[in-house]
Amino acid sequence: MVYIVFMLLVLLPVLAGWGRIFSHLFGAIFSGISFYLLAGIFTVATLFTLLSFFLPLNIYVEGGTLAVGLLSFFYFKMYRDFRLFLARNALYFIPLSLVTILFGSYFPFILDHFGYYVPTIKWLSEVGMVRGISNLDLLLGQMSVWHIFQAGFSNFSDPFLRINVLMLLVYVVYIFEKHSWLHFIFLPFLFFFCQSPSPDLPVIVISLMLTNEFLHFNKKITLLFIFSVFVFVIKPTMVWLPLFALLYGVVILKVRLKVIIPGILLLLLFFMKNVWTFGFPIFPLELFDLGFSGQPNAELLRNSAEMAIMKTYDMQYAFSEIERFSKLDYLKNWLFLSGIKGKIHFAFLLGLITFLLFCVKRKSRILWLLFISILFKSILVLLFSAQYRFFLDVFLVIVLVIFYETVSKKIPLITFSCLSVLGLLFLSFPGQLKDLIPSFKLGSFMTGFNTNQFYKPSHFELKKYETHQIGNLKFNVVQDYPFSFDTPLPAISPAFIQEDVDAGIFPQLKGNSLKDGFIWRKISAEEKEKLKIILKDLPR
């Protein structure tokens, strides 16, 4: 916890300083510290994305970023704003912050932390954004803007990757500044995302903040749209938010489309990033093939698409079975999956129906626009990969829309307190959660409370690997574990080596260094046998 407090003491003023520069140049969506912090996150994340094309996000980049942010913080005397905020809200804000920090100190338990988040951040901080890196490891082709942001602060300020704790505190500051007490209800749920740099947390938090502004008819549409696009570039499943912002501007505010130009420019940067790392504008889809080099092997992309469909059904059906589904079966089997995920899917459908009936009752244009946007997102996700985690934001937005005008401060605070205690018990004694919900697989990866958490966040260390070479690529393979989260670069997880072997290909360096990027080539029978020997006895 001490390490997380240090991270917050460093990064909160730094990001506020950057946000003050942004608001001085471009204005603000709303007043208060929370916007300065949000704008700081936006500005630094965009800057890091641009820099990562050319250089690693190392200690020198981090040092320069910290220096500029702190200079701005003191130049604009922003410590006065922080002091005033604490004077007004310290009684509730400080205990709530400590609870947030405590949640953030637990062991990471989301599997993507080890197979995707940490390796991505490692590449960005040590090498930068690498062209065609999806040829080495398809997952790395995503390179979320949130991980670019985290990577830039992973050298000194936040080596344990708890940036999501900071994002949650930005949200808490917003709640206090806006007196939007209903948002307290969402915090216990979000606490489960702050042990890892999961992009799910920032997109949910920012979408709730922006939706709150839309519902109060904020007219800063240019900024609302570009921040909505920012949410999309962090996680493209949030496509409903920029669509809603666009519809809100055109239908409600009746503005001209030129106001979306800054957002379109940010979107183009997102497409450039994806083309650079993946070869196509939108990961992991083979859409809009512009003929760029460095695209992954077609068989690997086909396997990825099939896996996404199987994950839609929680791996309870083989792809060949799913292909034989009728349109009715496709929906029915998704709704009635065995285990907790089927119940979540059914609750999602009930949520959409409830939202529809609420829109009919209220007869509000803005609510109808929001419903249309969420329905559009839902249909897209159903078509490509309807995993329950892609719908989590929708549940919270529906609750916000239905209750934001009617709930007093008392009910959210009581709900927050009860659910937070329950959440701490689950994280501290995960065996009870596994017994209560056997089908909740993530419960198996929770490790409980450790007294060392009071000093530094709990984290895993393995550092077991072997080095091999195929062609011009010397690579490291983790031992006794399926994910290469702390294996020196370049590292390839056993599962991806197996996919390469099955496809008869293997990645190669495009030039003389890792920064030059990767391509793939066919392998010889001798190389294939060597890879099979490497894979023998490795977990996959």
Predicted stretch roles:
Residues 1-82, 219:
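Membrane-embedded, hydrophobic transmembrane alpha-helices
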Residues 17-24, 164-177, 326-364:
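Hydrophobic, aromatic-rich transmembrane alpha-helices
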Residues 48-52, 188-192, 221-247, 262-268, ...:
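Membrane-interface alpha helices of multi-pass inner-membrane proteins
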Residues 102-176, 194-196:
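Active-site lumenal/periplasmic loops and adjacent helix-entry segments of GT-C-fold
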Residues 122, 200, 206, 234, ...:
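Hydrophobic/aromatic-rich transmembrane helices and adjacent perimembrane loops
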Residues 296-313, 421-540:
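Intrinsically disordered, polar/acidic, low-complexity terminal segments
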